[in-house]
């Protein structure tokens, strides 16, 4: 905020991603938790990423369930890469998915060209981190992109909540 060319407020910085998915329809095949709903239906396709604070309203969370969504690009388009942002915060029982499965469709019924992205866990009980995973180079066309981030389900033996239900948190899906 400036008054007479004098800065009167604090500055902030936010990265905005431009993607073919921005503002597109997202079908939630598994619903996110009402407790961690981000900004609602468009959270994963709004171009905004979360901080390392899980409650900053940029993250959506799934407890024990997989993140399972289908994005409708509204027309068939060339796709070269898919990226996703995830939060890892073991102290809050938030773990990275074990892997992500992407599949693609022209008609929204038949999905093919499955691509699996392996994700390696971070340091046990390390500090919170935002991790971005990506598909690598794709060379295909599709209208619908199905994204399934597989939740590990339960906290590992080394965790204080061993056996308890884990969370998967995501803030953005970027389609190039």
Mark where each language-model region is:
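Surface-exposed loop and turn segments in beta-propeller and other repeat-based domains
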Residues: 118-124
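Short, solvent-exposed polar/charged micro-motifs at secondary-structure junctions
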Residues: 38, 125-126
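Short intrinsically disordered coil segments
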Residues: 31-33, 118, 162-164
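Aromatic, loop-rich ligand-recognition surfaces of beta-strand-rich domains
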Residues: 51-115, 127-176
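N-terminal non-cleavable signal-anchor helices
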Residues: 2-4, 46, 101, 118, ...
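Short, compositionally stereotyped local motifs that mark structural "simplifiers"
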Residues: 1-68, 87
């Amino acid at each position: 905020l400036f008054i007479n060319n004098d800065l009167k407020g604090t500055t902030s910085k936010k990265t905005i991603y431009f993607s073919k998915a921005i503002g597109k329809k997202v079908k939630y095949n598994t619903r996110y938790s009402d407790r961690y709903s981000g900004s609602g239906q468009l959270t994963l396709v709004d171009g905004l990423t979360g901080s390392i604070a899980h409650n900053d309203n940029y993250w959506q969370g799934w407890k024990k369930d997989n993140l399972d969504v289908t994005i409708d690009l509204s027309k068939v388009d060339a796709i070269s890469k898919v990226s996703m942002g995830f939060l890892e915060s073991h102290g809050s029982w938030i773990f990275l998915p074990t892997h992500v499965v992407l599949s693609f469709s022209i008609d929204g019924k038949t999905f093919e060209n499955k691509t699996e992205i392996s994700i390696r866990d971070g340091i046990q009980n390390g500090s919170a981190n935002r991790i971005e995973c990506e598909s690598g180079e794709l060379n295909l066309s599709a209208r619908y992109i199905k994204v399934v981030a597989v939740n590990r389900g339960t906290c590992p033996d080394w965790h204080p909540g061993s056996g308890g239900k884990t969370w998967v948190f995501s803030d953005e899906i970027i389609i190039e």
